[in-house]
Amino acid sequence: MMHDDPNEAGLPPHNDAIPDETAEGADEVNPLHHRRIRSFVTRAGRVSTGQRRALDEFGPRFVVPYAPEMPDWDAIFGRSAPRILEIGFGMGASTAEIAAHRPSDDFLGVEVHEPGVGALLKLIGEQGLSNIRIIQHDAVEVLEHMIAPASLDGVHIFFPDPWHKARHHKRRLIQPPLVAHLASRLKPGAYLHCATDWQNYAEQMLEVLGAEPTLENTAADYAPRPDYRPVTKFERRGLRLGHGVWDLVFRKRAD
């Protein structure tokens, strides 16, 4: 997810891991694994003193260790509630804001970058949020091993790395195998919400999501920004400069 000031965190605006060029061959084994953790190197980002303190203080409660097994999410959250998965929450400002405004929903954020995890934990502590849990691991493996079929009420993927060069488009997160896997984890009627500020990526998202037979678009093409998704300072700056932002909201078909 895009965060308010990426430069302060030592991270670029689009906060995905960077594939290791030498590991591209691993992608050919299973197309779903185009974001496998062994094919990635994380961008170097400085963990601030406040983030480190939050990692130490709140990590034991709110960070769920990755394990290749299905956890008891009701026990982890301490209740049974609608569950939303967010892939790549960046520095977590929007995640915290959404969770604060939707206290009856639970949010599971997946992020590989430690500064972002620390930043969100800091917000959790400052705001007294209890409906967020974090996994610091590759999202594909989390999806495969820790999320049961038809168990999610929603998925958020906000401002993933656009990989704007044409030769890098195959590295984009929104690809047919991943979308099919995400759709399999959604309950009937649950939603998948993507957002991007790159028109070419928005067009690809629309094509890929529209081709998934178990999903249906909630709009003719792009959706109005739902009220629950906040506009970040970084996004607002882009809008002032005339940059577009595209939201796509699809739902899992009931049949």
Curated annotation (Swiss-Prot):
CDD domains: AdoMet_MTases. InterPro entries: SAM-dependent_MTases_sf, tRNA_(Gua-N-7)_MeTrfase_Trmb, tRNA_methyltr_TrmB_bact. S-adenosyl-L-methionine binds at residues 86, 111, 138, 161. PROSITE patterns: SAM_MT_TRMB. Pathway: tRNA modification; N(7)-methylguanine-tRNA biosynthesis. Residues 1-31 are annotated as: Disordered. One of its GO terms (cellular component) is tRNA methyltransferase complex. Residues 18-27 have a biased composition (Acidic residues). Keywords: Methyltransferase, S-adenosyl-L-methionine, Transferase, tRNA processing. Substrate binds at residues 165, 197, 232-235. Catalyzes the formation of N(7)-methylguanine at position 46 (m7G46) in tRNA. This is tRNA (guanine-N(7)-)-methyltransferase. It comes from Burkholderia cenocepacia (strain HI2424).
